[in-house]
Structure formats: C-alpha cells, structure tokens
C-alpha cells in the first residue's frame, strides 16, 4: 500500500514538473516573440533635396506615424536620409510612393509612405518580417533597404506659382490680349444675334407664304 502511494506521489510530482516546464516554455516563447515584434528596423531614402527634412522628422504610413528620421547625409547630387521604423510588425509594401509633404500651420515637413499595392499575408517571406533573413525585398521593405523618395506638397512651390501668376497679370501684353479677345467675342456675339434675327424673319416670311398658298 505504501509502495503504491509513493508511485502515485512520484507520478503527481512528475506531472507537475512537466506542466511547469510547459507553461514556462510558452511564457518564454511569447516574451521572445513579442520582443521580436517590437524591434525596430531601418531603411535609407534618397531625395534630390532636403525639403526641410531633419533628424526627428516624422515618417508616416497611410497617415499614421510609424517612425522617424535618425540621420541625414549629403552628397554632391542628393540627400540620403536614414529612417527608423519603430516596430518590425509594421510591414510596408515595396511598391509604395515615398514623398515629402508639409503639414500644419508651421509647415512641418513629414515623410509620407503611401502603399500602391496590397500584400498577401500568405507568403512566408512576408510573415517572417523585415528583420528576417528570408525577407523578400521585392515584396516588402526589408531592413537596410535603399529607397527613392520624391517631392510632394510644398508651400514654397505654391508661393512661387502664385508670384508667377501675379507677375503675369502685371504684364501689359496680357491685358491687351484679353481686351482684344473680349472685343472679338463681343463682335461674334453681335453677329450671332443679327444672324438669329435674320433666320427668324426668314422663317416668319416662309410661314406667311405657306399660309397664303393654303388659302388660295
């Protein structure tokens, strides 16, 4: 009886030990997996000009902040920015429009990433994430990828365009041209009115002649 009790007690201790090891393994796996998801990754974006970009400039994906600029270097022909995406769980399609825009009352510059295609999460290379060695840089932006950016909405361009338009209106040749165009349009409208009156008179004359013929 005592031997049977000892065997049962040993089996109970073994089951508790295995259960504890299993729970500890699951907890460690969740912690490691969650930590991996929160790891940041970087990419490089080349622009023709800085366009107001500086360290700390926000990087947005579909309008939401996902990272920032952490470094800027200058070459003879372009500006190379280093961006940091806060979480490796942020998957960015490779076919995306990357442009600088100015927002707010202070015209703060931001880098907007606008995906131009949808991703299929069935691909293992996409599930692996941008930090994985199996990351497919033809589908998504992987860690340390090199990208090309463009200039987007810029208030300096708007001011220059407005200045050019105002300068055009100050040109006397433009006013002479508009005056000549308006004069020709008035002449055409007068001729059109005369033509419609003549057509009306002719139609009235024809109708009267037809009525006379019917009466005869």
UniProtKB/Swiss-Prot annotation:
The keyword Plastid applies. GO terms for molecular function: lipid transporter activity; phospholipid binding. Its main location: plastid. Pfam families: MlaD. Keywords: Chloroplast, Plastid. GO terms for cellular component: chloroplast inner membrane. The keyword Plastid applies. It is found in: Plastid, Chloroplast. This is Uncharacterized protein ycf22.
């Amino acid at each position: 009886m005592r031997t049977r009790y000892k065997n049962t007690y040993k089996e109970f201790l073994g089951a508790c030990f295995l259960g504890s090891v299993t729970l500890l393994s699951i907890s460690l796996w969740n912690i490691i997996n969650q930590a991996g998801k929160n790891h940041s990754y970087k990419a490089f974006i080349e622009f023709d000009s800085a366009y107001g970009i500086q360290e700390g400039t926000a990087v947005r994906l579909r309008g939401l902040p996902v990272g920032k600029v952490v470094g800027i270097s200058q070459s003879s022909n372009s500006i190379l920015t280093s961006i940091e995406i806060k979480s490796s769980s942020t998957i960015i399609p490779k076919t995306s429009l990357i442009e600088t825009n100015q927002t707010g009352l202070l015209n703060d510059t931001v880098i907007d990433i606008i995906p131009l295609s949808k991703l299929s999460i069935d691909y293992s290379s996409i599930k692996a994430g941008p930090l994985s060695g199996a990351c497919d840089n033809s589908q998504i932006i992987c860690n340390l990828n090199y990208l090309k950016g463009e200039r987007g909405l810029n208030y300096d361009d708007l001011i220059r365009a407005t200045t050019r338009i105002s300068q055009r209106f100050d040109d006397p040749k433009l006013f002479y041209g508009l005056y000549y165009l308006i004069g020709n349009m008035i002449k055409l409208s007068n001729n059109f009115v005369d033509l419609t009156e003549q057509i009306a008179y002719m139609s009235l004359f024809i109708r009267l002649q037809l009525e006379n013929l019917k009466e005869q």
